[in-house]
Amino acid sequence: MELVLKDAQSALEVSEATFGRDFNEALVHQVVVAYAANARQGTRAQKTRAEVTGSGKKPWRQKGTGRARAGTVKGPIWRGGGVTFAAKTQDHSQKVNKKMYRGALKSIFSELVRQDRLIVVESFGVDAPKTKELKAKLDAMQLQDVLIVTPEVDENLFLAARNLYKVDVRDVAGVDPVSLIAFDKVLVTAEAIKQIEEMLG
């Protein structure tokens, strides 16, 4: 199959296995959920009444003071006491094997092609790290909500895009399922397309 280059009167021959396969919604959902889960730190932690530092002594005698009876200063109704159902550190990570991950990326790229959301250009960049220059380029292409994928990190492009809302720049190695589906359009250079094909086999 062929992908038409937007900035040149030509087309790029690509593998149908990577850019023309059926959309596997269940697989994409599983990989996206796992990717988001793996980004979680899971370091939230609170202390129960057994773990709070403090004396185990009864604060005052049971009867005769006129105050409510109390057996510990570490109970959950006390300020500085333990938490009733204390949160503990958790490992939220989910295993996704390489075949599943690559399959999900292929499904996403294929769906982007079908929906005309994948824009392929011969090359894309800016001469200086100027947001104004990049904004003018994107406006000329009628792109506001876009992920730009280049073969390798272009510092000028990265710095120029940093202050633009709903614009992000990634190299091929930094592409992930969540970022691909988060943007309205995905702008990819011809060289990056070749690298994606090699990466996804």
Swiss-Prot record:
Question: Single Gene Ontology BP term?
Answer: translation
- Which pairs are disulfide-linked? none
**Gene Ontology terms: cellular component:** ribonucleoprotein complex; ribosome
| Matching InterPro entries | Ribosomal_uL4, Ribosomal_uL4-like, Ribosomal_uL4_dom_sf
What keywords sit in the KW lines? Ribonucleoprotein, Ribosomal protein, RNA-binding, rRNA-binding
List the GO molecular function terms. rRNA binding; structural constituent of ribosome
State the residue spans of region: Disordered.
45-71
Q: Does the keyword Secreted apply?
A: no
Quote the PANTHER family the UniProt record gives: 50S RIBOSOMAL PROTEIN L4, LARGE RIBOSOMAL SUBUNIT PROTEIN UL4M
| Physiological role | One of the primary rRNA binding proteins, this protein initially binds near the 5'-end of the 23S rRNA. It is important during the early stages of 50S assembly. It makes multiple contacts with different domains of the 23S rRNA in the assembled 50S subunit and ribosome. Forms part of the polypeptide exit tunnel.
Report the family membership: Belongs to the universal ribosomal protein uL4 family.
**NCBIfam families reported in the protein's UniProt record:** rplD_bact
**Self-association and partners:** Part of the 50S ribosomal subunit.
What is this protein called in UniProt?
Large ribosomal subunit protein uL4
Tell me which species this is from: Shewanella halifaxensis (strain HAW-EB4)
Gene transcribed to yield this protein: rplD
